[in-house]
Amino acid sequence: MSKDKRNTIKVVDCQVLAHYKFEGDQYILTLSSEVIALETKPGQFVHITVSDALSMRRPISIMSVDIENGTFDLLYKVVGKGTRQLSERKVGDVLSVIGPIGNGFELTNKKIPLLIGGGVGMPPMIAIAQQMKDTDHDPFVILGSEVPFPFTPELSKMGNPCPKASHTMPQLEEWNVACRLASLQDYEGVFKGYVTDLARVYL
């Protein structure tokens, strides 16, 4: 790791501002940190202390940031003891966080990037879509999940490039970023198949 990259990594005590549970043991955690919100690049992650009883930090991708309010969001799924203890943290709790970590994504000259992510691969795609929303990159996002999505899919009011899918992630719709959803489950408005199958339909 270069000295420049080390200098951007901080150890910060972050307060839990919100902690929402979704079906499939999925959670969205909102933490306060002006420095992490300001310095995060899409595709980066943090190492987070989940409880005083477990010294080993857990790596979790950053899903979105709010620079104005100095906060950032993490999406995670309970898969073991560490994430189970993290899921028990309450609003007002303070967690030790190291980050942002990783190289992150660099924007390219591609006019219409296709961003594809499923499961734990969704947060980095949402993060880069957030960065692109105020540029001329005009991304199209495909998100997939085999458990219920960690948000309530809604009918998109944007143009539909994929006739077999009509629903989107509300946050991306709010950002005016085109998105469609894929799953092997029978969810309303969601393409039935893998994200790669939906990508072929789009292309």
Regions found by a protein language model. Give the residues of each.
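FNR/FR-type flavoprotein reductase catalytic core
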Residues: 81-203
